[in-house]
């Protein structure tokens, strides 16, 4: 397993649409998911899409366990949202690709999803609350959409500028 670099805005690769995984869940895909999970835990975060580490495949990892609980990793290959309920709720979201930025985004409180798990088994289930929000957020990444794309242009531009400035500060600090 290896910790990979997480892409941050305004990296254009984050706007790519990810391709389906062909040939099922192979050892290479499992190795990718293992790296993604280690990267996500190191960040730390609760979800990560493969495109966030520069791999344009429809793969997501997630762990919604609270601090102090046993890890509960989940793996999603070629996930699809089959159905959502009409009721939407605002949730405060953040993103490892938009570090230190948080804002309200409206999402369906419940959605039905289908995906292949770590072992290649097809799963069809309903996701609710934080699970529903997180899967929708991560699946947006697979379509090249970031949570800040739901914000006003002003808020989005400010978020990108803040991330750019933080990168410049970090580079300067590393140089000293």
Curated annotation (Swiss-Prot):
It catalyses: N-terminal N-formyl-L-methionyl-[peptide] + H2O = N-terminal L-methionyl-[peptide] + formate. One of its GO terms (biological process) is co-translational protein modification. Keywords: Hydrolase, Iron, Metal-binding, Protein biosynthesis. The keyword 4Fe-4S does not apply. Binds 1 Fe(2+) ion. Its cofactor is Fe(2+). The active site is at 138. SUPFAM superfamilies: Peptide deformylase (SSF56420). GO terms for molecular function: metal ion binding; peptide deformylase activity. HAMAP family: Pep_deformylase (MF_00163). Belongs to the polypeptide deformylase family. It holds the Pfam family Pep_deformylase. Removes the formyl group from the N-terminal Met of newly synthesized proteins. Requires at least a dipeptide for an efficient rate of reaction. N-terminal L-methionine is a prerequisite for activity but the enzyme has broad specificity at other positions. Its EC number is 3.5.1.88. Fe cation binds at residues 95, 137, 141. This is Peptide deformylase. The gene is def.
């Amino acid at each position: 397993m290896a910790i990979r670099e997480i892409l941050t805005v305004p990296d254009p690769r984050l706007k790519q649409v990810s391709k389906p995984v062909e040939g099922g869940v192979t050892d290479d895909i499992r190795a990718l998911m293992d790296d993604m999970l280690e990267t996500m835990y190191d960040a730390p975060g609760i979800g990560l899409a493969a495109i966030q580490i520069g791999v344009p495949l429809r793969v997501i990892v997630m762990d919604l366990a609270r601090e102090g609980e046993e890890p509960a990793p989940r793996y999603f290959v070629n996930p699809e949202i089959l159905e959502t309920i009409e009721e939407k709720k605002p949730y405060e979201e953040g993103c490892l690709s938009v570090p230190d930025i948080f804002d309200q985004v409206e999402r369906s409180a419940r959605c039905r999803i289908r995906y292949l798990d770590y072992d290649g088994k097809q799963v069809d289930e309903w996701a609710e609350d934080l699970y529903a929000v997180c899967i929708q957020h991560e699946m947006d990444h697979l379509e090249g959409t970031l949570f800040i794309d739901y914000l006003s242009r002003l808020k989005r531009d400010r978020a990108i500028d803040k991330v750019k400035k933080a990168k410049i500060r970090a580079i300067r600090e590393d140089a000293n």
